[in-house]
Amino acid sequence: LNSTLPNAIIMNYGDNDTFPLWYAQEVEGVRKDVRVMNMSSLGAEWYIDQMRIKSNDSDPLPFSLPRSKYTYRNETVLIQELFNRPIPAKQLNEWIASEDPRTMLPMTSGEKMDFLPSRQIAIPVNKQNAIESGIVKPEDAHLMVDTVYLNINPNKHYLTRDELMLIDLLANFDW
């Protein structure tokens, strides 16, 4: 906790990693500005709801998807590749958040299901914020890329709720 930047987010994958950090924050008062996020719980809507509210001195996580898009009926988002090019993550979030029937796939049951129209996701890098926050040293600025690209495996046919929320977080986290 003490080695992180102010208002950092620590992502881990289990209770054995999470509970000692929470203990340090809640009982010993260590770095209450840092948000500890247990990725194995990020698939639960109640946990996403908790991450969306202020906790101690930690701001809410900047998720943009409305609750209706990650509740019990939306455990997965299908991948139907309409575009063979990178789509900005914020634009993908807007696509998923939309209730426009054109952004959904019809199912045999008659229901419509959200889907991602590309396997390639582009996440712009705010270089100035990365330098000002201390993530990147000013003398290394020339080494920074403008965009980080995520490529979803061609054998993967859907994203789980936790994967979708991680993309949402990356889309709205201004480095």
Where are these regions (language model features)?
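ER/secretory pathway lumenal C-terminal domains and tails of membrane proteins involved
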Residues: 1-7, 23-175
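Short periplasmic/luminal acceptor-recognition loop of GT-C membrane glycosyltransferases, typified by
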Residues: 8-22
